[in-house]
C-alpha cells in the first residue's frame, strides 16, 4: 500500500499563508490534494501541518490530517524530519509519496507515471526532476592548495557543451520512497534512486506572487488548436485521446474532436477528394471558433490537404500541427477492416493514400508511429511539446 504525505506548514516568507492562498478560486493546497486523491496508486492521503486552518480545510477534502509540532514547522525544518514524524503514525505502508503543495501543475497522471517507473525497477526511491543548463559542468572549484579543479571532471570545462552529459534539478513535485529504506536512512536520495522527468511548465513551484500569477495564467491557457492528422490506421485517434486526457487534467477548457464523429455531425455524404476537402474546411472553421472562445481543441482528422494546412495557419491564431507518420506497409498490416487491401485491389474507391493523393505537412511535430511500441512515451513527448509551445510567451 502507498501513502501520500502532503506537508503544509503555516509560515511562509514569500506569500503569507501560502498554502491557503487562492489560485483560480481554489486554495493552493487543493491542487495537490486533488492530484493525490485522483491517483490510481495512492491508497491513503495525509496532510501534515501545524495550522488548524490548513488541517480543517484538509479534513473537508476527506483526507487524513496530522497536527505537526511547532518545532517541526520552522523555516529551517527539513523535509526528511517532517516525513519521519508522519511515518511514526503510519508505519504499515510499503511506500510513501511526498507531495509538496507548492507544485500545483503536478497532476495525478504525473504521480501515476512516476510510480510506474519506480515500481517497474529495483529502485528504493524516485525524485521528479526537470532538465537544467549543463554549463555548470564547465565550472571550476579551487581546492585548499589554491589549485583549480573541474567541478565534476577535469575534462568537462574544455568539452563542447553538446558532448557534456545532461543535467537535472529536483523540481520538488514528487518524491517516492520505500518506507523501510527511508526509516533506515532518512534521506530522499537512496542507494537506488530513479528519476521522473517533467517539463518546465509542470515543474513550476510557487515561491512568490510572480510565480502565483504565472501559474494562474497557465491554468487559464487561452484557446488554441492542436491539429493531429495522419492516414487511417496511423494511430492519430489513440494519440489524440492520450494527449486530451493529459491536458484535461490541467486545463479544464480542453475538448477532443474526432474526425469520424465530426463527419456525422456535419452530415458528411461522401469520401471523394472534394467532399473530404469540404468536410475538412467545416472542421477547421469549428476549431477556429472554439479556440477564439478560449477552448483548447485537440482535433484528430485525416484532412491531409495542403489547402487545409494553409487555411489553419492563416485563420487560427494559436495553432500547433502534428503529423502521425506511418508507412503504407504497416498500415496494410493494421488494416482490420480491409480498407487498404480493398482499395489496392480496386474494390474500394476514394481512399486517402491509395487513389487520393495526400500532402505530408511541414508540421510543428512529427510522430513516427511505424511501431505501436512506446506509445505512452510518444504521448508524453507530444504533451510536453504542446504545453511548452503554447506557454512559451508567458
From Swiss-Prot:
Keywords: Capsule biogenesis/degradation, Nucleotidyltransferase, Transferase. It catalyses: an N-acylneuraminate + CTP = a CMP-N-acyl-beta-neuraminate + diphosphate; N-acetylneuraminate + CTP = CMP-N-acetyl-beta-neuraminate + diphosphate. Its EC number is 2.7.7.43. Pathway: Capsule biogenesis; capsule polysaccharide biosynthesis. Belongs to the CMP-NeuNAc synthase family. Nucleotidyltransferase involved in the biosynthesis of capsular polysaccharides. Catalyzes the condensation of N-acetylneuraminate (Neu5Ac) and CTP to form CMP-N-acetyl-neuraminate (CMP-Neu5Ac). This is N-acylneuraminate cytidylyltransferase. The lineage of its organism: Bacteria, Pseudomonadati, Campylobacterota, Epsilonproteobacteria, Campylobacterales.
Amino acid at each position: 500500500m502507498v501513502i501520500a504525505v502532503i506537508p503544509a506548514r503555516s509560515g511562509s516568507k514569500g506569500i503569507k499563508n501560502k498554502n491557503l492562498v487562492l489560485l483560480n478560486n481554489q486554495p493552493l493546497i487543493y491542487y495537490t490534494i486533488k492530484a493525490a486523491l485522483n491517483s490510481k496508486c495512492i491508497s491513503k492521503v495525509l496532510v501534515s501541518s501545524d495550522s488548524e486552518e490548513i488541517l480543517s480545510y484538509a479534513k473537508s477534502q476527506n483526507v487524513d490530517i496530522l497536527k505537526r509540532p511547532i518545532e517541526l514547522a520552522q523555516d529551517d525544518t527539513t523535509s526528511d524530519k517532517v516525513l519521519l514524524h508522519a511515518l511514526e503514525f503510519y508505519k504499515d505502508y510499503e511506500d510513501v509519496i511526498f507531495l509538496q503543495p507548492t507544485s500545483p501543475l503536478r497532476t495525478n497522471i504525473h504521480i501515476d507515471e512516476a510510480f510506474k517507473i519506480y515500481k517497474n525497477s529495483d529502485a528504493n526511491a524516485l525524485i521528479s526532476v526537470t532538465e537544467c543548463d549543463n554549463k555548470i559542468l564547465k565550472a571550476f572549484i579551487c581546492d585548499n592548495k589554491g589549485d583549480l579543479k573541474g567541478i565534476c571532471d577535469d575534462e568537462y570545462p574544455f568539452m563542447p557543451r553538446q558532448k557534456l552529459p545532461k543535467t537535472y534539478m529536483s523540481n520538488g513535485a514528487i518524491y517516492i520512497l520505500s518506507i523501510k529504506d527511508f526509516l533506515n536512512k532518512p534521506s530522499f536520495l537512496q542507494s537506488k534512486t530513479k528519476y521522473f522527468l517533467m517539463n518546465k511548465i509542470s515543474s513550476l513551484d510557487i515561491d512568490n506572487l510572480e510565480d502565483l500569477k504565472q501559474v494562474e495564467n497557465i491554468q487559464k491557457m487561452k484557446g488554441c488548436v492542436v491539429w493531429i492528422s495522419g492516414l487511417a490506421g496511423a494511430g492519430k485517434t489513440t494519440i489524440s485521446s492520450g494527449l486530451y486526457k493529459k491536458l484535461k487534467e490541467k486545463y479544464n477548457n480542453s475538448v477532443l474532436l474526432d474526425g469520424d464523429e465530426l463527419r456525422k455531425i456535419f452530415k458528411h455524404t461522401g469520401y471523394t477528394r472534394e467532399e473530404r476537402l469540404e468536410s475538412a474546411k467545416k472542421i477547421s472553421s469549428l476549431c477556429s471558433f472554439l479556440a477564439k472562445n478560449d477552448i483548447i481543441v485537440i482535433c484528430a482528422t485525416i484532412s491531409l490537404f495542403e489547402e487545409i494546412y494553409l487555411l489553419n495557419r492563416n485563420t487560427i491564431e494559436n495553432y500547433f500541427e502534428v503529423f502521425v507518420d506511418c508507412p503504407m506497409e504497416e498500415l496494410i498490416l493494421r488494416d482490420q477492416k480491409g480498407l487498404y487491401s480493398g482499395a489496392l485491389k480496386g474494390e474500394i474507391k476514394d481512399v486517402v493514400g491509395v487513389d487520393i493523393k495526400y500532402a505530408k505537412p511541414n508540421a510543428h511535430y512529427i510522430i513516427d508511429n511505424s511501431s505501436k511500441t512506446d506509445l505512452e512515451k510518444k504521448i508524453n513527448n507530444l504533451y510536453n511539446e504542446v504545453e511548452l509551445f503554447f506557454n512559451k510567451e508567458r
